[in-house]
Design a protein with these regions (language model features):
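Primarily recognizes the serine-hydrolase "nucleophile elbow" in alpha/beta-hydrolase
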Residues: 160-198
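Short amphipathic alpha-helices and their capping/turn segments at secondary-structure boundaries
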Residues: 26-33, 104, 190-193
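Short, flexible loop/turn elements at secondary-structure junctions
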Residues: 16-20, 30, 46-48, 121, ...
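N-terminal cap/lid segment of alpha/beta-hydrolase-fold proteins
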Residues: 2-40, 75-79
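Loop/turn elements at helix/coil->beta-strand transitions in domains of secreted/extracellular proteins
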Residues: 37-40, 110-113, 172-175, 196-198
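Cap/lid segment of the alpha/beta-hydrolase catalytic domain
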Residues: 36, 44-156, 167
């Protein structure tokens, strides 16, 4: 969808099918150079009762043309303001909780391919509907009454993302890890237990 060259690596915004019915966007970071395959990391964002951003907590956000322009190709002031809100929010989050360091960007600069997605209801998978914590609680509660679990859906998405990452030509599928803090640590624990790729 789009690309941003950074210091020692490139950031891509991509889309892929998480299952037969759902296509999601993700950030993918790829180190520059290298003749062989790179080790890789699935970067899993936290909860923090903050659903407005997801993958942007792990990888410094950037915006592709369709996120900046109107249908006629002109820069949209409304989209520009929305993008700035996302960037400011992500920077504030990372400064407050990660000492100003985007974990995914750090790993890419040190030779890892990094993939990060939004968990269901976070970031782009929830922002359009409005980020209301009460909606999250209602949906999670209703799923439990139906014998379903939102964290199981997250884990399924994380496993599918790992399979996608392993399929990329620049990735050494035998050297994939995962990282996350708080809910991201829980997701890492579940992914490590349920995926043979980790």
């Amino acid at each position: 969808l789009g690309e941003d060259q950074r210091d020692g690596y490139k950031a891509q915004k991509i889309a892929f099918n998480i299952n037969a019915y759902s296509r999601i966007t993700a950030y993918l970071l790829i180190p520059d150079g290298g003749d062989g395959k790179f080790p890789a990391v699935v970067a899993l964002h936290d909860h923090g009762a903050h659903l407005f951003i997801g993958k942007e907590k792990m990888i410094r956000p950037f915006f592709i043309a369709s996120e900046k322009q109107d249908a006629d190709g002109k820069i949209s002031e409304k989209k520009k303001a929305a993008n700035q809100e996302i960037l400011d929010d992500a920077d504030a989050w990372v400064n407050q909780l990660y000492e100003g360091q985007y974990v995914g960007d750090y790993l890419a600069k040190h030779g890892y391919v990094v993939l990060s997605i939004d968990a269901p209801m976070w970031g782009e998978r929830g922002r359009k509907e409005g980020v209301d914590r009460n909606k999250y609680d209602l949906i999670a509660g209703n799923m439990m009454m139906l014998g379903r679990d939102l964290s199981a859906f997250m884990t399924y998405d994380d496993i599918s993302s790992t399979e996608f990452l392993a399929s990329l030509p620049m990735v050494d599928a035998k050297r994939i890890g995962c990282v996350g803090c708080s809910m991201g640590a829980y997701r890492s624990w579940m992914l490590s237990a349920l995926s043979d790729r980790i």
